[in-house]
Curated annotation (Swiss-Prot):
Residue ranges annotated for the Toprim domain, each copy included: 262-344
One cellular component (GO) term of this entry: primosome complex
InterPro entries the record matches: DNA_helicase_N/primase_C (IPR016136), DNA_primase_core_N_sf (IPR037068), DNA_primase_DnaB-bd (IPR019475), DNA_primase_DnaG (IPR006295), DNA_primase_DnaG_DnaB-bd_dom (IPR013173), DNA_primase_Znf_CHC2 (IPR036977), DnaG_bac (IPR030846), DNAG_N (IPR013264)
Gene transcribed to yield this protein: dnaG
Pfam family, one: DnaB_bind
Name of the protein this chain belongs to: DNA primase
Matching Gene3D superfamilies: 3.40.1360.10, DNA primase, catalytic core, N-terminal domain, DNAb Helicase, Chain A, DnaG, RNA polymerase domain, helical bundle, Zinc finger, CHC2-type domain
EC number: 2.7.7.101
Native organism: Pseudomonas aeruginosa (strain ATCC 15692 / DSM 22644 / CIP 104116 / JCM 14847 / LMG 12228 / 1C / PRS 101 / PAO1)
Subunit-level organization: Monomer. Interacts with DnaB.
Cofactor(s) for this UniProt protein: Zn(2+); Mg(2+)
Chain ranges of zinc fingers (CHC2-type): 40-64
Domain notes: Contains an N-terminal zinc-binding domain, a central core domain that contains the primase activity, and a C-terminal DnaB-binding domain.
Length: 664
């Protein structure tokens, strides 16, 4: 599809992507402390030197130097171009890739920023936590949580809080100018009355449940009312960072407790998740006011081989289970397992696990959980009685098209055989039925009863098949890094050839050029030296003022330095690899990686002085360039057209020229 991919979409996509999930779906990772390790997929090795950091969301190989974020990994591992890699990750996240036409934008690199909603939501969570500890009206919330048997430790682990009664507690605490209020609306923290324009807190007099994404960032809230207000449970609305059909409450907390989960239990509510955790069962998650979707299933199967659905035994619970089964079937590969556990009428996981304890609840799972195939045929036989010919015909009509959705060949074949045994139809007849849609089933159920609320990677603002930036020649006066050996003998990600500016940069052909003769030199340009210094000493960025005024559009190296400064000023904790990963697959990224790998020759005591000498020179060069451009413009005019200021500029120029010795 033609058109540009907006940078905001790339940022959102990376924010919703867990690099551990992406990498582990392609190579086998082993937990090593906080990180994961493996033998590098990009070069041959016997001892693992490839590391994936879930906290920093990047990978790095200490053997060959390969590194980047999730998008870069997909590009290099799957040998995809940038747009195709974006499509791959977007498909995984259940997102459609938008495209926009280029609209007269310049080529100046601009840094993406994390959504401002994340710190705002985090601040709101802290406000709710403090209110649970100290607000005068907290007693009802504390009593509710104690009544559910929760300890302070569990409340801390899940970040539980309290939204006090009143219309503007959070508004007064976090509110500010119109931009801040707009951000609070965008984050779903405030509601605006469409008639009066009045804004007020969305959550009032509720126990608060922060909802986290796979990286632990707070993206939304759920609130359980303490009084008689409706609805009983209220979720945040859809926002730029929260998409309820994809997120699962408690998934982050479950993985924090055990990164090597082999099964995840899906329950219906926040309190079910928390009550199970209180009793030592730390693998439960819950959907957020929606039925279990295919996106939920895909996400869970990327993490674990087995899913257990645990629902109430009432009609609503059984309807929810069937809808979950319908979402499971198209994703049920051989080797994956799904089970269903129904609790006694009037019980839910919260009440039952508190009544009988962890051991008895686990025994219940072992003894009573039904395999998917057993549950599937049991439910259909309740609707179509196989004791009659008419019932067998109806059963086959219902079951055959559903079985056809199963991608796992072995399981699909075995379930067809079971259907043949029940109905007496041949496999050929069942295959013919599979291509006919079943009649509407009484198992097609309505929506969930939970009421919802109201409604780094890049050097430019947009992405296309090629980077959108000014020509980027290899720097004069620096030794290029030796290329690492590629894992693919036919395609090298970087062979050292610089772009000569004579033709369009071909990102798709990166690595297909012949390397030029290298001429070692001893002097590195001051701008490149500053870039390298900043990569190794990012704290220096915080001492630079007005970084955006340091570089003219024609100076691509200075522009890159400015981009690094701005990125570090927005997030000072970024590592060298995270910075390099922002430009993965572009000439800037390869230059930064080469600079980062070069031998360090600057005396430590001179680092800061040399760095700020370069910053000063760039600033002076910028001012001089602006003056020269203005002077050229003035000299195009006749003297009578000049303003007094322009005449003064001209006199100053000729005065300086007259007093300066001539140069040959």
């Amino acid at each position: 599809m033609a058109g540009l991919i907006p940078q905001s979409f790339i940022d959102d996509l990376l924010n919703r992507t867990d690099i551990v999930e992406v990498v582990s779906s392609r190579i086998q990772l082993k937990k090593t402390g906080k990180n994961y390790s493996a033998c590098c997929p990009f070069h041959k090795e016997k001892t693992p030197s490839f590391t994936v950091s879930p906290d920093k969301q990047f990978y790095y190989c200490f053997g060959c130097g390969a590194g980047g974020n999730a998008l870069g990994f997909v590009m290099d591992h799957d040998q995809l171009e940038f747009p195709q890699a974006v499509e791959e990750l977007a498909k995984r996240a259940g997102m459609d890739v938008p495209r926009e036409e280029r609209g007269g934008r310049g080529h100046t690199p601009r840094q993406p920023t994390d959504s401002p909603l994340y710190p705002l939501l985090s601040a709101a969570a802290e406000f709710y936590k403090q209110a649970l500890k100290s607000h005068p009206a907290r007693k009802a919330a504390v009593n509710y949580l104690k009544g559910r048997g929760l300890t302070g430790e569990i409340a801390r682990d899940f970040g539980l809080g309290f939204a006090p009664p009143g219309w503007d507690n959070l508004l007064k605490h976090l509110g500010g100018d119109n931009l801040q209020l707009k951000a609070m609306l965008d984050a779903g923290l405030l509601v605006e009355n469409s008639d009066t324009g009045k804004r007020y807190d969305r959550f009032r007099d509720r126990v608060m449940f922060p909802i986290r994404d796979s990286r632990g960032r707070i993206i939304a809230f759920g609130g359980r009312v303490l009084g008689d207000d409706k609805p009983k449970y209220l979720n945040s609305p859809e926002t730029p960072v929260f998409h309820k059909g994809q997120e699962l409450y408690g998934l982050y907390e479950a993985r924090q407790k055990n990164r090597d989960l082999d099964e995840i239990m899906v329950v219906e509510g926040y309190m079910d998740v928390i009550a199970l955790a209180q009793q030592g069962i730390r693998n439960a998650v819950a959907t957020l006011g929606t039925a279990t979707s295919e996106e939920h299933i895909k996400r869970l199967f990327r993490l674990v081989p087995s899913i257990l659905f645990c629902f109430d035994g009432d009609q609503a619970g059984r309807k929810a289970a069937w809808r979950a089964l319908e979402s499971v079937l198209p994703n049920l590969q051989d080797g994956k397992r799904v089970r269903f556990l129904f609790l006694p009428e009037g019980e839910d996981p919260d009440s039952l696990v508190r009544a009988e304890g962890e051991d008895a609840f686990r025994a219940r799972i072992t003894q009573q959980a039904q395999p998917l195939a057993e549950y599937f045929f049991q439910q259909l036989m309740l609707e179509a009685d196989p004791a009659t010919l008419e019932g067998k015909a109806h059963l086959a009509t219902l079951a055959a098209p559903l079985l056809e959705k199963i991608p796992g060949n072995n399981l699909r074949l075995l379930m067809r055989q079971r259907l043949s045994e029940i109905t007496g139809l041949s496999g050929e007849n069942i295959g013919q039925l599979a291509h006919h849609s079943p009649p509407p089933s009484s198992m097609d159920h309505g929506a969930s009863g939970v009421l919802d609320g109201d409604d780094y990677f890049a050097a430019s603002a947009y992405y296309e098949n090629e980077p959108s930036h000014a020509p980027f020649d290899a720097a004069p006066g620096y030794v290029e890094a030796q290329p690492r050996k590629s894992w693919n003998k036919d395609k090298k990600p970087w062979d050292g050839k610089k772009w000569d500016g004579k033709k369009k940069w071909d990102k798709g052909g990166r690595g297909d050029f012949k390397a030029p003769q290298r001429t070692p030199v001893s002097v590195e340009s001051t701008t490149l030296n500053a870039l390298r210094t900043l990569l190794h000493h990012p704290q220096l960025a915080l001492k630079v003022d007005d970084a955006g005024t340091l570089a003219r559009e024609q100076d691509t190296y200075a522009q890159l330095l400015v981009s690094l400064l701005e990125a570090l000023q927005k997030n000072p904790r970024q590592s060298s690899m995270q910075l390099i990963a922002r430009w993965h697959g572009t000439p800037q990224g390869r230059l930064l990686q080469a600079l980062g790998e070069k031998e360090w020759l600057i005396v430590q005591e001179n680092l800061e002085k040399q760095f700020f000498d370069t910053i000063t020179k760039l600033s002076e060069s910028q001012r001089f360039g602006e003056r020269e451009e203005r002077l050229r413009s003035v000299m195009q005019k006749s003297y009578s057209e000049l303003t007094d200021e322009e005449k003064a500029l001209l006199r100053e120029h000729y005065s300086v020229a007259a007093s300066s010795p001539s140069q040959s």
